[in-house]
Amino acid sequence: SGLRIERDLPDALSLDRERSIAVFRLVQEALTNVQKHARATQVDLVLETRDDRLCLRLRDNGIGLDPSKTRKLKSHGLRGMKHRVDAFGGRFDIGAAPGGGTVMTVEIPLTDLP
């Protein structure tokens, strides 16, 4: 495929089943979108915990997103990703990366809110 993926992942990460599945699906959909649409040669994937949140960032060096699709999340895949994050009370952002390409950032609470 010619897509290089640079990963910065924690040595150990303990997530409940629902969050594990959500993160897997988010990364899967994001990489599928990059492969199909971005014409990218590299993706940087960072997964870390900060305070009580799981933080995921994917950045590619592709052609970028059509702003009309990101503004209102018109793409079915992007809407699905946002809904998946919203289910945990998280935050989902996607847009142009500085210097070109696309960056997606996700923050999900590590525990359910009471």
Language-model features, listed with the residues they occupy:
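Coiled-coil dimerization/phosphotransfer module
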Residues: S1-P114
